[in-house]
Structure formats: C-alpha cells, structure tokens
From Swiss-Prot:
Belongs to the SNURF family. Encoded on a bicistronic transcript that code for two proteins, SNRPN and SNURF. Only the primary 1.6-kb bicistronic SNURF-SNRPN transcript is detected. The lineage of its organism: Eukaryota, Metazoa, Chordata, Craniata, Vertebrata. This is SNRPN upstream reading frame protein. GO terms for molecular function: ATPase binding. The gene is Snurf. Disulfide bonds: none annotated. InterPro entries: SNURF (IPR009847).
C-alpha cells in the first residue's frame, strides 16, 4: 500500500515538471472533452484543481494567440 502511494506521488511530481508544450497539448486534449465526460470524471478534475471556467478562458486566449488574424 505504501509503495503504491509513493509511486502515485512520484508520478504527480514528475507531471509538474513536464515541458510547457506538452502541458499545452494535454490541456487542449482535456478541454476537447464534452461537458458530459467531465461530469463522468469528477475526481480527476478535482485533482487538477483547475476551475473549468478559467480553463476554457485560458484555452480560448491561447487559441486566439495562435490563430493568424485576417488570414
């Protein structure tokens, strides 16, 4: 039991040190989930501790920043 908890903690700490690009890819994939799917995984969203509203706003900003205007 103790070993399993250590492994989980290790995984969590390594995730925090992932390069920014990979984090953005992960975020985008998470945001593409439908609202229904988000309700199916309440525990996962609690672990991330990121409010969905802030999440979507941040994503929209990133998307607008990447999209060339008037192209």
């Amino acid at each position: 039991m103790e070993r399993g908890r250590d492994r989980l903690h290790l995984r969590r700490t390594t995730e925090q040190h992932v390069p920014e690009v990979e984090v953005q890819v992960k975020r985008r994939r998470t945001a593409s989930l439908s609202n229904q799917e988000c309700h199916l995984y309440p525990r996962r969203s609690q672990q991330q501790q990121v409010p969905v509203v802030d999440f979507q706003a941040e994503l929209r900003q990133a998307f607008l920043a990447e999209t060339p205007r008037g192209g």
